[in-house]
Amino acid sequence: KLGQKLCSKKAGGRVPEYQRQELPDATKWDHTKWSPNYRNDNRIETHESGTAPCKTACPAHVAVQGYLKLAAQGRYDEALALIKRENPLPAICGRVCNRRCEDACTRGRVDAAVAIDEVKKFIAQRDLDAATRYVPPVVTPTRAGGFDQKIAIIGAGPAGLSCAFYLAEKGYKPVVFEKSERPGGMLTYGIPSFKLEKDVIEAEVEIIRLMGAEFRYGVEVGRDVTLDELRAQGFKAFYVAIGCQGGRLAGIPGEDAEDVTVAVDFLRE
């Protein structure tokens, strides 16, 4: 019967007393009920440092929750500027990112993770389609003629492009040497166009060029020009970003047969 278990034999047949909970609308709020440091102390569903799980999971540590809020408010240019603080290639990443942020999104425990990568892709695509694109502000040197230190970046893959972006942002004029005829490294030669369009890569590189970086294609450092020769030309610093584009076979019989090749070489060709 309904309520038959309310009586306890241990209580002598009496109905046990249950602790009453104070309802929020009947609570008198004072300094003992809340903390002025709530925003800093409340770290439920966050990393130990207080950082949101999505930002912690992101290899670039992009301020995910920040640009999502800006996008929700329709402030797309500000959202793009915030993304580019940590990720200079958002249009590329919006297409090929493996979405670790969404794997860590706590909304996924309720229904589905926030579509973080799609929002980033939308913000970046909006900029690609704009008549006037967003070019991050560059530090203006106080001395006449700007910074005179010449910096060489060897390789125009993701690492080399990122280095060129942040150096240009700080007011330097880096020179990027790339042995291929197009920038991007494995972005260009390792990812098929149906997944990542080549014109998207070119568009991202164009922004870095507008910021002040110089690109020299078809120049292989070590063969066409040596480091000593570059030093003689006045280069004071070098950033080596030649990549690690080696492939590997499956380790099965017959892999040494004629016309058997690794995936990296196949994609490049």
Give, region by region, the residue ranges found by the protein language model.
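General small-molecule cofactor/ligand-binding pocket signal
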Residues: 175, 214-218, 261
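Short hydrophobic core segments
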Residues: 154, 177, 235-243
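N-terminal Rossmann-like FAD-binding beta1-loop-alpha1 element of flavoenzymes
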Residues: 149-175
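Phosphate-coordination loops involved in phosphoryl transfer and adenosine-cofactor binding
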Residues: 147-150, 218
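Glycine-rich FAD pyrophosphate-binding loop
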Residues: 172-188
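N-terminal Rossmann-like dinucleotide/flavin-binding domain of flavoprotein oxidoreductases
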Residues: 80-87, 119, 187-235
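Ferredoxin-type iron-sulfur electron-transfer modules and their immediate structural context
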Residues: 1-147, 198, 240-268
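Residue-level detector of alpha-helix initiation sites
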Residues: 88, 157-158, 182
